[in-house]
Regions:
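Conserved divalent-metal-coordinating catalytic cores
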Residues: 169-171
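A short beta-strand element within the Helicase C-terminal
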Residues: 160-161
């Protein structure tokens, strides 16, 4: 629930402030960079953007995880914030009052690769890699007597086109 996510974020926030020795906006890449690279100096020559700000992307922070415990907490905080805003709080608002379901739109001619995409909301991107993502995925439940089917076929659109066209070169 949103309450659980918020409680976990508050604990992480308190711990981050304790490790940093001060309060700052954890959602601000600039302030995170100033704390990690300016104040705590966890790296000798940190990367900077064209505007002179420290780079605090997930990739950079992942590479520095062993340098300071605060980094794991910042990454965890960012992850929870993303899940909270994108799924936990947003998806319930998208439930159709008539059907009690969330409806997506599948787009056939949007991607450069010809693959299907999903939007409003993107239900092809529901997290599953970690425990929090698995909990979010559990919110999607099939009606009694029905089931969800998930398949990820390599180049399925191209394979269907080859089959339907009967083109010997494609088959």
């Amino acid at each position: 629930t949103a309450k659980t996510f918020n409680e976990r974020m508050q604990k992480l926030e308190s711990h981050i402030y304790e490790l940093a020795g001060e309060k700052f906006n954890i959602a601000s890449p600039k302030q995170v960079g100033d704390i990690l690279f300016g104040k705590m100096q966890i790296m000798e020559k940190p990367k900077k953007t064209k505007t002179g700000q420290y780079v605090t992307s997930e990739e950079v922070l992942q590479s520095l995880r062993s340098k300071a415990p605060i980094i794991d907490d910042i990454l965890a905080y960012r992850g929870l914030k993303k899940l909270l805003g994108t799924y936990v709080e947003a998806l319930p608002k998208l439930i159709n009052p008539k059907t009690g379901r969330i409806h997506t739109s599948f787009n056939q001619a949007v991607t450069a690769t010809g693959r299907l995409s999903s939007s409003d909301p993107n239900l092809q991107n529901i997290p599953v890699r970690d425990d929090d993502g698995k909990e979010i995925r559990k919110c999607f439940v099939a009606e009694p007597g029905c089931l969800f089917f998930s398949a990820d076929y390599s180049q399925i659109e191209l394979r269907i086109m080859a089959h339907l066209s009967g083109d010997e070169n494609m088959i």
